[in-house]
């Protein structure tokens, strides 16, 4: 029998911690193998205030999953939520390499490179860089600029930022349990992926996720996240 390869996600909330494990199916989708939820203390409005209490809850949930599946969890993706997660917009531009032949993928990549060089404030880190739209010669807004004729290609990106201290505390809590954090994802963007259709994202929709300590809000329009916020309760 072929050994399964598992993907683990850990969501540490203000009232409980959820550990979910999935495996890849033949059709490429992810099948859920186990989900365990345990009450948690030591977390307030998404921020770890007591690492021992939070760690004990994570340990209990992880141990139950390991017992159920007969595996040892050593790495996982994590979700994070709190008022320390926010979005900010940034606009930049490049001059196209060959205006006579239209925008090519290299021009778009050059614009992405400029956005990747944008630095967060010292106390924050950038989690996501999401293009909102493109402008050709500052006149016409387009969704895919490749093939458009212009000298100047501009774009506005939505940056999702997270405070470094809450992120470091989450990483520390997992490392104390021997779990390496492969990546971290804002919960405000994770929930819409589970509940929204592509048509809903296209037409415009807001998702409000009311949790035990915070409420996550995400607004989608024309297929991309336009705004995210986390409100402490």
For every predicted segment, state its role.
Residues 1-16, 20-207, 224-228:
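Nucleotide/phosphate-binding catalytic cleft detector across ATP-hydrolyzing
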Residues 14, 211-214:
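Short, glycine/acidic-enriched loop or turn micro-motifs at the edges of active sites
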